[in-house]
Regions:
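Bacterial N-terminal signal peptides
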Residues: 6-19
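C-terminal capping alpha-helices of c-type cytochrome domains
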Residues: 154-201, 289-305, 309-320, 330-401
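Positively charged n-region of N-terminal signal peptides that target proteins for export
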Residues: 1-4
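Sec-dependent signal peptide cleavage junction
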Residues: 23-27
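Short glycine/threonine-rich turn/loop motifs
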Residues: 29-141, 206-332, 336-339, 347-352, ...
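Class I S-adenosyl-L-methionine-dependent methyltransferase module
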Residues: 147-148, 158
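Boundary at the C-terminal end of the N-terminal hydrophobic targeting segment
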Residues: 20-22, 224
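Short His/Asp/Glu-rich catalytic/ion-coordination signatures at enzyme active sites or charged loops
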Residues: 149-152, 197-208, 213-217, 356
Length: 401
């Protein structure tokens, strides 16, 4: 009999079974365990994570998650039928595309690196600049961005889901809607429900820190953890709690990335951006089609001068699988990332002083050996799996396996 891990969110119960391992990391990235070990991994697959937050107005059901999965992978929702959500958030590449910036329809490129969907359910806001508060809002944007899916509006998507027999039946089953009653909000809720099942804990670090297995990480990784907490000051933003670790404060910081090319022009850029925004400019489109506008960061959302060049702290979970790094994909390796911080947020080391740099960013004075230790620790944050969770139907109480 399968061993199941059950945890509740209000009336919703999630469960795990070996079937959840249908979406696994690339074999070159993560080794699959013997079948005899699978159940143990299933039982502990959320070690180190808190309960997944589920919106009251969008409860999880197996049918909704399955519908969201189909929508996430449907390439028809793009101007030329070549781009789906999974094009930039590939199941087999840790739900990223491993490119500096993503490639949309017709080979067009944007300005920002595609963050992993793994554990995105825990963020307090979505996108690098936090311009959407939740996964529902986030899921709508890429379809109508000119350098992503490229649709002129959401109407082509609604035409498909309202007329495709399989989608008609699924939306009727999940939301009890049909025809014009079926809106983009329903599409977004299904996609978001699917994305909330893409969670992964149980890394070697979790087994060491939360599971009490002192042999789960190497001595070098333990030294790196000490640096993470101490001299490296990483934990200031990539936070740890007593019973879980999201490795993000969900806040926004200017860490120096991307500022070299624009900092002398920031006053003019900020003024021009605000003028365009006040005249009805779409922030989503402006920041993904204009490299310089992109570097304004959180300012583009809040208009706050203190947030110029500030971007959201990403989780460090599974970071060894999601290269290249930073909001613009400009750093190729974890070692480059650590060196950037070691230099006080300056890359290259000869770059001019950044007046917008967040106050906590300063030289760390790490030795080469310490840099290697810290990188080794970051590699210990890789989960053995990042499965889709199995969801119990909150209306029937039955588990979907």
């Amino acid at each position: 009999m399968c061993r199941l891990l059950l945890f509740t969110f209000s009336t919703v119960v999630f469960s795990f079974s070996p079937a959840v391992f249908s979406q696994q990391p690339s074999p070159s990235a993560v080794n699959s365990p013997p079948a005899s070990e699978a159940n143990a991994l299933v039982v502990n697959s959320l070690l180190g994570l808190p309960a997944v937050p589920i919106p009251i107005n969008n409860p999880q059901t197996p049918a909704k998650v399955n519908l969201g999965d189909k929508l996430f992978h449907d390439k028809r929702f793009s101007i030329d039928g070549t781009i789906s959500c999974a094009s930039c958030h590939d199941d087999n590449q840790a739900f990223t595309d491993n490119l500096p910036v993503s490639v949309g329809h017709g080979g067009l490129t944007g300005t920002r690196n595609a963050p992993t969907v793994i554990n995105a359910a825990f963020y307090k806001s979505q996108f690098w600049d936090g311009r959407e508060p939740d996964l529902e809002g986030q899921s709508k944007g890429p379809f109508i961005n000119p350098v992503e899916a490229g649709l002129p509006s959401h109407e082509p998507i609604l035409e498909i889901v309202r007329t495709d027999p399989a989608y008609q039946a699924a939306f009727k089953d999940v939301f009890n809607v049909a025809g014009k009653q079926l809106t983009m909000d329903h599409v977004a809720k299904a996609i978001a429900s699917f994305e909330r099942t893409i969670v992964a804990g149980n890394s070697p670090f979790d087994r060491f820190y939360f599971g009490g297995d002192k042999n789960a990480i190497t001595e070098q990784q333990q030294r790196g953890f000490e640096l993470f907490l101490g001299q490296g000051r990483c934990v200031s933003c990539h936070t740890l709690e007593q019973d879980h670790a999201l490795f993000t404060d969900s806040r926004f910081h200017n860490i120096g990335i991307g500022m070299n090319a624009v900092q002398d022009d920031v006053p003019r850029l900020a003024e021009a951006f605000l003028a365009a925004k006040n005249q009805g400019g779409d922030v989503d489109k402006m920041v993904l089609t204009d490299k310089k506008a992109s570097e304004l960061g959180r300012f583009a959302v809040t208009d706050g001068l203190s947030e110029i060049g500030a971007f959201k702290t990403p989780t460090l979970r599974n970071v060894s699988l999601t290269a290249p790094y930073m909001h613009d994909g400009s750093l190729k390796t974890l070692k480059e990332v650590v060196i950037h911080y070691n230099n006080g947020g300056v890359t290259p080391a000869t770059a001019p002083v950044n007046p917008y740099l967040s106050g906590g960013i300063r030289p760390l004075n790490l030795l080469d050996k310490q840099i290697d230790d810290l990188v080794a620790f970051l590699e210990a944050l890789t989960s053995d799996y990042y499965p889709k969770t199995q969801v119990a139907d909150s209306q029937t109480g039955g588990r979907h396996e």
